Regions:
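N-terminal positioning helix adjacent to the helix-turn-helix/winged-helix DNA-binding module
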Residues: 146, 171, 193-204, 240, ...
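A short, N-terminal "cap"/entry segment at the start of jelly-roll beta-barrel domains
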Residues: 1-35, 39-42, 48-49, 131-135, ...
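Basic/polar phosphate-binding segments, predominantly the helix-turn-helix DNA-binding elements
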Residues: 174, 178-184, 193, 209, ...
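Charged, amphipathic alpha-helical coiled-coil/dimerization segments
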Residues: 126-127, 238, 252, 261
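Basic, amphipathic alpha-helical hairpins
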Residues: 153-164, 179-188, 203-216, 236, ...
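A ubiquitous short alpha-helical element
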Residues: 50, 134-142, 192, 220
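N-terminal regulatory/effector-sensing and dimerization cores
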Residues: 31-128
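Amphipathic alpha-helical segments enriched in hydrophobic/aromatic residues interleaved with Lys/Arg
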Residues: 2-17, 117-174, 178, 186, ...
Length: 309
């Protein structure tokens, strides 16, 4: 019982220190890049509407407030007692659901390098490189004292910028090791292992991102993954929670929304630019994902952002 109590006290202590460091190095709400290239700090004094984007591999540790992330129809909620890992590029929606001016949402976000993960896998266990079945490429796990300790030490380097070039890579490597050693570390491990089904799905995802405007050719994607088409569908859905076609639609629709918001472009023109042949089909699928047809959605977005067309 004493060990459990000490562990809980350590977690709370590290969370408080990390919160203080993030408050110190964030000037108001928003995403704050730091002198450590892979590290950004996020702060919000209010809850938010859902935002849609493609998230690259990353670790997110929240010390105050909470957030919900949607991957297809699956929901993942995390806050001060847990952390989130995304192991490959995934189109998700994210919403801060707990935040206030007195207790703002605070998040430590670290980009993950799968090559570094592979190096650690090889060093930690160079003999056993067993390729397991595909697993979902996003997970939430309980925070640990060693992980938070490393996050605190990395953030503390912002007070001593001259130490960053030497010490930051070592601590980032330690953080990655802690994630790999976690209960769901196999997700990241399998994604890093060349030739594993998860790694081959990551290759397909990269191809879909490059060619999202082109017609979907399952045979070509299957060949790139060295899988049969039926096997590709199964593994792709296990990792991303969606089919290749659904993934492509998410990419197209998110890019369309970005273009409509940033360029005040015509909806039909944007539909063709992102690969749709039918503006009416584009409008239907847009409304299904974002809740409103294109023009109504962009009007709502501008109101939320306080922007004038």
């Amino acid at each position: 019982m004493r060990d459990l109590s000490n562990h809980a006290n350590s977690l709370v202590s590290y969370q408080k220190e990390l919160s203080l460091l993030m408050e110190k190095h964030t000037d108001g709400d928003g995403i704050h890049e730091t002198l450590i290239p892979s590290l950004s700090l996020i702060r919000s004094s209010k809850t938010t509407f859902p935002s849609f984007s493609v998230h690259e591999p990353e670790l997110c540790i929240v010390t105050q407030g909470s957030k919900v992330v949607m991957l297809a129809d699956e929901s993942f909620t995390y806050g001060p007692s847990s952390y989130l890992v995304i192991s490959l590029d995934l189109p998700v929606s994210a919403q801060i659901i707990e935040a206030s001016p007195d207790v703002p949402y605070l998040c430590f976000r670290l980009k993950l390098n799968l090559k570094d993960a592979l190096d650690l896998v090889n060093e930690a266990n160079p003999v056993s490189r067993k390729k397991l079945r595909s697993k979902r490429g996003l997970f939430v796990e309980q925070s640990t004292a060693p992980l938070l300790d490393a996050a605190v030490r990395l953030t503390r380097l912002l007070d001593n910028p001259e130490d960053i070039p030497i010490l930051a890579p070592l601590i980032v490597r330690e953080i990655l090791y802690r994630v790999l050693q976690g209960e769901q570390g196999d997700v990241l491990r399998q994604m890093a292992l060349r030739g594993s089904s998860s790694n081959r799905i990551a290759v397909v995802v990269e191809q879909l991102k490059r060619e999202y405007m082109e017609p979907l050719r399952i045979d070509e994607l299957a060949a790139a993954a060295h899988m049969a088409p039926s096997s590709l569908h199964r593994h792709f859905k296990e990792v991303t929670a969606m089919s290749p076609l659904q993934y492509q639609k998410q990419l197209r629709l998110q890019e369309a929304r970005r273009l409509l918001l940033s360029e005040s472009a015509d909806a039909a023109d944007v539909a063709f630019r992102v690969g749709y042949e039918s503006p009416s089909q584009f409008s239907r699928e847009y409304a299904r994902l974002f809740g409103l047809p294109p023009i109504s959605d962009i009007t709502r977005l501008r109101e939320q952002l306080g922007r004038v067309p």
